[in-house]
C-alpha cells in the first residue's frame, strides 16, 4: 500500500521491498504538495509507484502485477531464506543429476572478449532445475542479482551482464 512522509524512510533500509503495481507508493511528499511548490502535475505512480521504484530508484526488489502475484513473489523469496540467523537456508531436493552436463555452455561465451553474451543463460543453465529467482530485474540491467540452488542448497548470485553496457 501507500507509504508517505517520514514513514517512507523505514522501507528504504529494509532487506527487501516488494511492491504491487497500481497499489504501492512510497514518497516523502505527495502529488498535491509537489503541485503547490513546483506547479507540476505528477501522479502518485510517477512520483513513487512500483514502476518508478523498480526501474529508476532501485528501491523495489520485486513487483507484483496484483496482490495475488505479489504474495506469490513473497512466498518464493522466503523459500530461499532461513527463518532466522541461526538456521541454514531451506534445502530443496532436485531431480537434476549431480554430474549433469550441458554442451550449450561450451558455445555461450564468445572467443572475442569484446563480444557480448547473455549471462542469464549461463546462470539458468547451471542452477538446479534451470531456475533463477532474480531480484531488481528492471533496475541496472548490466548487473544480475538473485537466488538459485546448486545441489539443493541456496546460493546467492551477483553477476555482470555483458549484454548491457558490457557489464558492471
Describe the residue ranges of each PLM region.
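Generic secondary-structure boundary/loop-capping signal
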Residues: 23-25, 30-34, 39, 44, ...
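Gly-rich Lys/Arg/Thr-decorated short loops/hinges at beta-loop-alpha junctions or inter-strand turns
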Residues: 32, 53-55, 100-107, 126-127, ...
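Conserved catalytic cores of soluble enzyme domains
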Residues: 1-86
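Non-catalytic terminal/interface segments that mediate subunit docking, oligomerization
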Residues: 114-168
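Short low-complexity stretches enriched in small and charged residues
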Residues: 13, 18-20, 108-117, 148
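Terminal amphipathic helices with adjacent charged low-complexity linkers/tails
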Residues: 62-123
Amino acid at each position: 500500500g501507500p507509504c508517505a512522509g517520514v514513514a517512507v524512510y523505514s522501507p528504504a533500509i529494509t532487506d527487501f521491498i516488494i511492491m504491487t503495481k497500481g497499489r504501492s507508493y512510497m514518497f516523502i511528499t505527495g502529488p498535491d504538495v509537489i503541485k503547490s511548490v513546483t506547479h507540476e502535475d505528477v501522479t502518485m505512480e510517477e512520483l513513487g509507484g512500483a514502476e518508478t521504484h523498480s526501474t529508476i530508484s532501485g528501491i523495489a526488489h520485486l513487483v507484483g502485477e496484483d496482490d495475488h502475484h505479489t504474495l506469490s513473489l513473497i512466498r518464493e523469496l522466503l523459500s530461499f531464506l532461513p527463518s532466522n540467523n541461526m538456521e541454514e537456508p531451506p534445502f530443496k531436493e532436485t531431480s537434476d543429476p549431480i554430474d549433469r552436463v550441458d554442451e550449450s555452455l561450451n558455445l555461450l561465451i564468445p572467443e572475442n572478449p569484446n563480444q557480448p553474451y547473455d549471462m542469464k543463460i549461463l546462470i539458468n543453465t547451471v542452477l538446479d532445475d534451470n531456475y533463477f529467482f532474480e531480484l531488481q530485474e528492471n533496475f541496472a540491467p548490466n548487473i544480475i542479482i538473485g537466488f538459485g540452488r546448486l545441489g539443493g542448497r541456496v546460493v546467492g548470485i551477483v553477476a555482470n551482464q555483458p549484454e548491457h553496457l558490457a557489464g558492471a
